């Protein structure tokens, strides 16, 4: 039977398809709709989202939800309608209001994530419209994108765009946008928003699909088959008929593939979503039955509808809303979740919740239906096999016996890196208890019955703590009883051998048990009834509060001095990015003969490569070739990258020198086949007669393995350190600090497309920040002249430094394949491979000695630093210079340092946004924190006393300090103190900490000084015959708004010709893609200054063009009265054969090419001492942007950089195993910030300071410096932990005032909890028992 469905209203019929084909594969390969992006392949990023619409003929109703097309199997959408972002609106039929508002609120930067964001918002709006009892509120607006990742914006403008559709929004709370000016009335604001009317803007379901009958859409493809049974009996027959050797897969949403990434192909896929018995929801007074094929979202809805009869159901629903993300819940089934937990040890929240309410399950075993408890189901041995099928779950309804003395209490818990985003928990728990009030004489609460369930702690599956339940049953609750229960629990919660943070997980179990029962002890005879909404609130364990809405304020000053420079112009192509029509490299249509590549990489750090083959010595399907270093042309070289400091190899030769090093490129007919083949590769290694690999900086020191650092990248020391130490009244000696790595997590993985061309030429499309270097490396590798190579880069889906050096081998490998095979070769790295090969930020080890006076004034600092550069130099030799720049932000008195760049057998590290600078600035803060702790002084006072005067600034930065009026840091420091109410809030934090035992707050103010350097940049401006303008620059648009600023600069520059209609010039300018044969010497797009350098380059071009046009203009003005239009002027110039194309290479003056950026950040956090969770309550930023070229762009860069910094300091673990191979390999274990982890109140002020004659129209950089301000969050967390440690020690009669500690980076939940005390609950209870 044909597979029939619709995409954006267009009918598609397919008679045969591989059942393993995903919807995303089909959309990208067989339709023109490229808005669906492959960001992770795991359902964890939201880039692939589409709206799935299903028609229910019985109800004559269309149901819509957003789903992950990267996981959804194509066969499962039979009879459905699919809507992509292009289907909402596009350039042809007009953009949807969602697209327009995303553009107008400046909510798109690189644009790779934007279509998925728009689909998420659209789906939520559609659901609200279809659900008459549910308004689209501000809360729903924030949740609508909670499962989507964005690495650029910091989410604030995205949330504002979403909130603009909310029924309860206060429009004045929305941030900077292009729809209204500050101060306009609410009526004007609402009027200027692009209008949204659900009747006009919701997509309609195609009529031809409403007539489609439900029949088995069985699809045969070679040996694989898809079948769709419509009853349990049919399902049984299909399974019985299967051959004994056949592998079967039952399918609902296929979301499990995102976690387990099954490599095997199944002989038969069975879609069970249409079986009524497995898709039903049945309710009665006994409880609820939920079919195994019911989606988690539908189960949540069913539980919420029954919340009036049982608050237990409501609590379960609330917890389940934290599972995965909305799109995963829309597809993933209850039964699938349970089966994965039973058979594959999936860390399930569902099993824990169901265990706590004593749920049962029904299974089909042959033709028999069996009922077992969930506990028995989880413990089945052998595990569930393909002949047994889970049919439904039965959840009993719990109501307390009549009378006032007895209550049922239910609560669930979940500790995860994100509250509502896509994150597996460290541990989950759910408790149900029947408790009774005893007679007044006894004054207490007795546990009559309880179910205590725990999961995700590293065991085989969720469990009931039976021993603890038995112990507590019948007991009158007291401190000693609870202490004994905790002891029993610690013996039950035993994480598996390789479980990360095992002690932390046990601590969570103890903490949650304490949170549940402790209020009952404190309340005396009163029962803390959640049923009545009267949960006892005390200062020991705060009640779980609903998250406050995100709020923000932005202060920017638009300037008319160089109009349109200085205006908050919408980013070029923002609406195009929102609709998904903006073309990235992987979106470029390819010819049918295009091949695809995937890397085979080493898993050993130092080994000889004996052989390379495939499993069972069978060449996988679709493979055309396997290319190694031996396939490089004889005249070429084994080179895959290069920098100023040397080349790096494309492939390992006979010896692999680090885990993750490229060994070969497998080339196949599809990307899917190439990736599968790479997984099936078998590399045989030999480590005999080889030295031990160098895997740590300590090993590098022992073996003197270092890269040379040129003197120009090694700053001079400042002052006399020996004298400074002699003057010190106090010293901290040999203190150690370590900083880890960070992954770029650009939303678009590394991508390239190479096409062979005539006469030994090759054309390459590369997602790169350095096309010029890509160009040179390819020519060198192939052994051809550079004029035979052409590299084109239009836009890059996020870079942050990761698309500079690391993009080169990807493009070069594709070029090698195309050159050798004479066919196009495209490669799109899967997220795992990308993460393994990325290198990331430089880890380092720091030791220091610091001298200071008793008032906190610093006198001297000595630093010893070891930087892990990895195998190749890359750009690592610049690190000493980059680190020391921001570190000098304080007046150290004197400063000396010994920095070594270590060569190790790890993948080479590379420049990541603010490379070295973020580490240097943080090192300074860590030292200041320890000095303050040593002196028992307020750390803010220590910071303030050591801020530079202008004289000391000159001492540490020399001429780069500029003129005295350019040193704005003291002004910013005082200004933010007032605007953030820093002093008042500091006192409020102290008061909060005195009143709360289990939550502590911290607040911190941090300054930054960031040194940047302008670079030579080419530009070209050409005026076409119709008066439109085309612009080329060496800089690459990577989301930072470079094209927008360049467009504004050209409009300003050409506007010097005073023609009629000049005010509309902006709309007539187009910045085009980078082409290395058309624009040479483009260099690296890095270091924050490429935008301003590119702007200056095109400004100089405009000066040339204006000089050529001015005589004609003057002549025309003399010959005719009145004004001259731009079009007439250009026509006249063309008629006179005036050269209307100008190019230049901007070269900044050496004396002024470097300058300093200043900013201050204040952050306040709250730490939960039970879980270690840190919530950022508020962040205030003030940043000196000079005269902003575009305030909207610079604001977006400031917020985005700050949030990326939060990731580095608080969340993102990017570690390696004992062989140096990266451990984190996707969205499941690498957590960047999401909507629910950014500051709840986020206030940013961009200060437009006075003229800086040596800057480009007095502007300053904004891309990297604000990232350093995120250290304020880390320092505030340290402050909160210090308060927790003080209280903990003082509770045990120990003076904790000078308790020194180092807070690692990142300060994840396990780290914070361990510093606050893994055993704080036990100690607290012991103290209570002693005090009785």
Swiss-Prot record:
<dbReference type="InterPro" id="IPR001041">
    <property type="entry name" value="2Fe-2S_ferredoxin-type"/>
</dbReference>
<dbReference type="Pfam" id="PF01315">
    <property type="entry name" value="Ald_Xan_dh_C"/>
</dbReference>
<keyword id="KW-0560">Oxidoreductase</keyword>
<dbReference type="InterPro" id="IPR006058">
    <property type="entry name" value="2Fe2S_fd_BS"/>
</dbReference>
<dbReference type="InterPro" id="IPR002346">
    <property type="entry name" value="Mopterin_DH_FAD-bd"/>
</dbReference>
<keyword id="KW-0963">Cytoplasm</keyword>
<dbReference type="GO" id="GO:0051537">
    <property type="term" value="F:2 iron, 2 sulfur cluster binding"/>
</dbReference>
<dbReference type="Pfam" id="PF01799">
    <property type="entry name" value="Fer2_2"/>
</dbReference>
<dbReference type="InterPro" id="IPR016169">
    <property type="entry name" value="FAD-bd_PCMH_sub2"/>
</dbReference>
<dbReference type="InterPro" id="IPR016167">
    <property type="entry name" value="FAD-bd_PCMH_sub1"/>
</dbReference>
<dbReference type="GO" id="GO:0071949">
    <property type="term" value="F:FAD binding"/>
</dbReference>
<dbReference type="Pfam" id="PF20256">
    <property type="entry name" value="MoCoBD_2"/>
</dbReference>
<dbReference type="InterPro" id="IPR036856">
    <property type="entry name" value="Ald_Oxase/Xan_DH_a/b_sf"/>
</dbReference>
<dbReference type="InterPro" id="IPR036318">
    <property type="entry name" value="FAD-bd_PCMH-like_sf"/>
</dbReference>
<dbReference type="InterPro" id="IPR046867">
    <property type="entry name" value="AldOxase/xan_DH_MoCoBD2"/>
</dbReference>
<dbReference type="GO" id="GO:0004031">
    <property type="term" value="F:aldehyde oxidase activity"/>
</dbReference>
<feature type="binding site">
    <location>
        <position position="45"/>
    </location>
    <ligand>
        <name>[2Fe-2S] cluster</name>
    </ligand>
</feature>
<dbReference type="GO" id="GO:0031625">
    <property type="term" value="F:ubiquitin protein ligase binding"/>
</dbReference>
<dbReference type="Pfam" id="PF03450">
    <property type="entry name" value="CO_deh_flav_C"/>
</dbReference>
<dbReference type="InterPro" id="IPR016208">
    <property type="entry name" value="Ald_Oxase/xanthine_DH-like"/>
</dbReference>
<dbReference type="InterPro" id="IPR036884">
    <property type="entry name" value="2Fe-2S-bd_dom_sf"/>
</dbReference>
<dbReference type="InterPro" id="IPR037165">
    <property type="entry name" value="AldOxase/xan_DH_Mopterin-bd_sf"/>
</dbReference>
<dbReference type="Pfam" id="PF02738">
    <property type="entry name" value="MoCoBD_1"/>
</dbReference>
<dbReference type="GO" id="GO:0005737">
    <property type="term" value="C:cytoplasm"/>
</dbReference>
<keyword id="KW-0408">Iron</keyword>
<dbReference type="InterPro" id="IPR008274">
    <property type="entry name" value="AldOxase/xan_DH_MoCoBD1"/>
</dbReference>
<comment type="subunit">
    <text>Aldehyde oxidases (AO) are homodimers and heterodimers of AO subunits. AO-delta is a AAO3 homodimer. AAO3 also forms a dimer with AAO2. Interacts with PUB44, and this interaction probably results in targeting of this protein to the proteasome.</text>
</comment>
<dbReference type="InterPro" id="IPR036010">
    <property type="entry name" value="2Fe-2S_ferredoxin-like_sf"/>
</dbReference>
<keyword id="KW-0479">Metal-binding</keyword>
<dbReference type="InterPro" id="IPR002888">
    <property type="entry name" value="2Fe-2S-bd"/>
</dbReference>
<dbReference type="InterPro" id="IPR012675">
    <property type="entry name" value="Beta-grasp_dom_sf"/>
</dbReference>
<dbReference type="GO" id="GO:0009851">
    <property type="term" value="P:auxin biosynthetic process"/>
</dbReference>
<keyword id="KW-0073">Auxin biosynthesis</keyword>
<dbReference type="GO" id="GO:0010293">
    <property type="term" value="F:abscisic aldehyde oxidase activity"/>
</dbReference>
<protein>
    <recommendedName>
        <fullName>Abscisic-aldehyde oxidase</fullName>
        <ecNumber>1.2.3.14</ecNumber>
        <ecNumber>1.2.3.7</ecNumber>
    </recommendedName>
</protein>
<comment type="function">
    <text>In higher plants aldehyde oxidases (AO) appear to be homo- and heterodimeric assemblies of AO subunits with probably different physiological functions. AO-delta may be involved in the last step of abscisic acid biosynthesis, at least in leaves and seeds. In vitro, AO-delta oxidizes abscisic aldehyde to abscisic acid (ABA). In vitro, AO-delta also uses 1-naphthaldehyde, indole-3-aldehyde (IAld), benzaldehyde and cinnamaldehyde as substrate; the AAO2-AAO3 dimer also uses abscisic aldehyde as substrate.</text>
</comment>
<dbReference type="InterPro" id="IPR000674">
    <property type="entry name" value="Ald_Oxase/Xan_DH_a/b"/>
</dbReference>
<dbReference type="Pfam" id="PF00111">
    <property type="entry name" value="Fer2"/>
</dbReference>
<feature type="binding site">
    <location>
        <position position="48"/>
    </location>
    <ligand>
        <name>[2Fe-2S] cluster</name>
    </ligand>
</feature>
<keyword id="KW-0411">Iron-sulfur</keyword>
<dbReference type="GO" id="GO:0009688">
    <property type="term" value="P:abscisic acid biosynthetic process"/>
</dbReference>
<keyword id="KW-0520">NAD</keyword>
């Amino acid at each position: 039977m044909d597979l029939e469905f619709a995409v954006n209203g267009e009918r598609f019929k397919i008679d045969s398809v591989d059942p393993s084909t995903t919807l995303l594969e089909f959309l990208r390969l067989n339709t023109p709709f490229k808005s669906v992006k492959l960001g992770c392949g795991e359902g964890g990023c939201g880039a692939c989202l589409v709206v799935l619409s299903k028609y229910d003929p019985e109800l004559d109703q269309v149901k819509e939800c957003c789903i992950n097309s990267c996981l959804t199997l194509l066969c499962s959408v039979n009879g459905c309608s699919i809507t992509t972002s292009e289907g909402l609106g596009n350039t042809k039929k007009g953009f949807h209001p969602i697209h327009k508002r995303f553009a107008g609120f400046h909510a798109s930067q690189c644009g790779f994530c934007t279509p998925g964001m728009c689909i998420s918002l659209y789906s939520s709006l559609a659901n609200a419209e279809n659900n008459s009892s549910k308004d689209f509120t501000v809360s729903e607006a924030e949740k609508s994108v909670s499962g989507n990742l964005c690495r650029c914006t910091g989410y604030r403008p995205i949330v504002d765009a979403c909130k603009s559709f909310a029924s309860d929004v206060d429009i004045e709370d929305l941030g900077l946008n292009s729809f209204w000016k500050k101060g306009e009335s609410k009526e004007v604001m609402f009027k200027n928003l692009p209008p949204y009317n659900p009747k006009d803007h919701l997509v309609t379901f195609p009529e031809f699909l409403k007539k489609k009958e439900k029949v088995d859409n069985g699809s045969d493809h070679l040996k694989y088959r898809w079948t769709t049974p419509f009853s349990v009996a049919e399902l049984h027959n299909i399974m019985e008929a299967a051959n004994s050797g056949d592998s079967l897969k039952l399918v609902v949403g296929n979301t499990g593939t995102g976690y387990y990434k099954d490599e095997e192909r199944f002989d038969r896929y069975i879609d069970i979503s249409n079986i009524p018995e497995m898709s039903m929801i049945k309710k009665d007074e006994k409880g609820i039955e939920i079919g195994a094929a019911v989606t988690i979202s539908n189960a949540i809805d069913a539980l919420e509808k029954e919340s009036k009869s049982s608050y237990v159901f409501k609590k379960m629903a609330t917890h389940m809303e934290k599972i995965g993300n909305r799109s995963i819940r829309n597809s993933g089934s209850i039964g699938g979740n349970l089966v994965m937990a039973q058979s594959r040890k999936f860390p399930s929240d569902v099993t824990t919740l169901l265990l706590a309410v004593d749920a049962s399950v029904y299974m089909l075993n042959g033709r028999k239906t069996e009922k077992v408890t969930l506990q028995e189901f989880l413990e089945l041995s052998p595990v569930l096999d393909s002949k047994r099928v889970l049919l439904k779950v039965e959840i009993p309804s719990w109501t307390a016996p009549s009378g006032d003395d007895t209550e049922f209490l239910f609560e669930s818990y979940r500790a995860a890196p994100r509250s509502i985003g896509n994150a597996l928990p460290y541990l989950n728990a759910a408790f149900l208890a029947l408790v009774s009030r005893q007679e007044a004489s006894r004054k207490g609460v007795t546990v009559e019955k309880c179910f205590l369930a725990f999961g995700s702690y590293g065991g085989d599956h969720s469990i009931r703590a039976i021993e603890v339940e038995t112990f507590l049953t019948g007991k009158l609750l007291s401190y000693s009883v609870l202490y004994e229960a905790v002891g029993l629990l610690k013996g039950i919660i035993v994480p598996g051998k390789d479980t990360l943070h095992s002690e932390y997980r046990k601590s969570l179990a103890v903490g949650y048990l304490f949170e549940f029962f402790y209020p009952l002890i404190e309340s005396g005879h009163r029962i803390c009834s959640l049923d009545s909404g009267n949960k006892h609130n005390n200062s020991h364990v705060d009640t779980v509060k609903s998250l406050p809405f995100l709020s923000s304020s932005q202060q920017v000053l638009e300037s008319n001095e160089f109009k349109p420079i200085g205006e908050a112009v919408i980013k070029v192509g923002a609406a195009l990015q929102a609709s998904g029509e903006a073309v990235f490299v992987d979106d470029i249509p390819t010819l049918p003969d295009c091949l695809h590549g995937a890397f085979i990489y080493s898993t050993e750090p130092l080994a000889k490569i004996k052989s390379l083959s495939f499993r069972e010595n069978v060449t996988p399907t679709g493979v055309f070739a396997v290319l190694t270093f031996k396939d490089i042309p004889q005249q070429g070289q084994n080179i895959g990258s290069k920098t100023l400091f040397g080349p790096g190899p494309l492939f390992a030769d006979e010896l692999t020198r680090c885990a993750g090093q490229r060994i070969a490129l497998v080339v196949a007919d599809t990307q899917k086949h190439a990736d599968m083949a790479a997984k099936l590769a078998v590399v045989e290694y030999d480590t005999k007669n080889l030295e031990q690999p160098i895997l740590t900086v300590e090993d590098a020191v022992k073996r003197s393995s270092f890269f040379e650092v040129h003197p120009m990248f090694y700053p001079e020391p400042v002052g006399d350190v020996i004298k400074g130490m002699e003057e010190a009244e106090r010293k901290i000696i040999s203190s150690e600090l370590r900083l880890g790595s960070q992954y770029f997590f650009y939303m678009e993985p590394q991508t390239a497309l190479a096409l062979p061309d005539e006469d030994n030429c090759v054309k390459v499309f590369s997602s790169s920040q350095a096309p010029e270097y890509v160009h040179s490396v390819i020519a060198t590798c192939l052994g051809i002249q550079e004029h035979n190579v052409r590299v084109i880069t239009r836009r890059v889906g996020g870079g942050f430094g990761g698309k500079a050096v690391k993009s080169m081998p990807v493009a070069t490998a594709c070029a090698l394949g195309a050159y050798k095979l004479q066919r196009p070769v495209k490669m799109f790295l899967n997220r795992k491979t990308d993460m393994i090969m990325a290198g990331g930020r430089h880890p380092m080890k720091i030791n220091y000695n610091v001298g200071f006076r008793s008032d906190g004034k610093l006198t001297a600092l000595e630093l010893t630093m070891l930087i892990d550069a990895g195998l190749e130099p890359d750009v690592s030799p610049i690190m000493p210079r980059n680190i020391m720049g921001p570190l000098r932000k304080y007046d150290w008195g004197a400063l000396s340092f010994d920095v070594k760049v270590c060569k190790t057998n790890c993948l080479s590290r590379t420049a990541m946004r603010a490379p070295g600078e973020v580490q240097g600035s943080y090192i300074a803060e860590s030292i200041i924190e320890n000095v303050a702790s040593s002196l028992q002084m307020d750390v803010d006072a220590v910071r303030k006393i050591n801020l530079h005067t202008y004289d000391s600034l000159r001492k540490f930065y020399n001429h780069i300090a500029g003129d005295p009026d350019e040193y704005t840091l003291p002004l910013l420091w005082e200004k933010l103190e007032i605007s953030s109410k820093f002093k008042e809030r500091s006192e409020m934090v102290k008061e909060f900490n005195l009143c709360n035992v289990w939550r502590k707050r911290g607040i911190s103010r941090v300054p930054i000084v960031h040194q940047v350097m302008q670079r030579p940049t080419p530009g070209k401006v050409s005026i076409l015959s119709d008066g439109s303008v085309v612009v080329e620059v060496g800089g690459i648009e990577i989301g930072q708004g470079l094209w927008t600023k360049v467009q504004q600069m050209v409009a300003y520059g050409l506007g010097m010709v005073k023609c009629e209609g000049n005010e509309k010039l902006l709309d007539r300018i187009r910045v085009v893609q980078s082409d290395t044969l058309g624009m040479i010497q483009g260099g690296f797009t890095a270091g924050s200054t490429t935008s301003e350098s590119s702007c200056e380059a095109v400004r100089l071009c405009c000066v040339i063009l204006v000089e050529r046009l001015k005589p004609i203009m003057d002549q025309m003005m003399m010959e005719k009265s009145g004004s001259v239009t731009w079009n007439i002027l250009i026509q006249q110039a063309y008629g006179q054969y005036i050269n209307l194309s100008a190019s230049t290479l901007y070269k900044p003056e050496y004396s002024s090419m470097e300058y300093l950026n200043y900013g201050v950040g204040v952050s306040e956090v709250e730490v939960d001492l039970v879980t270690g969770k840190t919530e950022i309550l508020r962040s205030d930023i003030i940043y000196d942007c000079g005269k902003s070229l575009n305030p909207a762009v610079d604001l977006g860069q400031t917020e985005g950089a700050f949030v990326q910094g939060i990731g580095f300091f608080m969340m993102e673990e990017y570690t390696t195993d004992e062989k140096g191979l990266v451990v984190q390999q996707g969205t499941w274990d690498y957590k960047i910030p999401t909507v629910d982890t950014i500051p709840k109140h986020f206030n940013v002020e961009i200060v437009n300071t006075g003229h800086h004659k040596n800057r480009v129209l007095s502007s300053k950089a904004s891309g990297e410096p604000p990232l350093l301000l995120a250290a304020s969050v880390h320092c505030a967390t340290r402050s909160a932990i210090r308060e927790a440690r003080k209280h903990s020690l003082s509770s045990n009669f120990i003076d904790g005032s000078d308790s020194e500690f180092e807070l690692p980076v990142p300060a994840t939940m396990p780290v914070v909890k361990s510093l606050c005390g893994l055993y704080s609950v036990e100690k607290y209870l012991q103290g209570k028992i002693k005090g009785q």
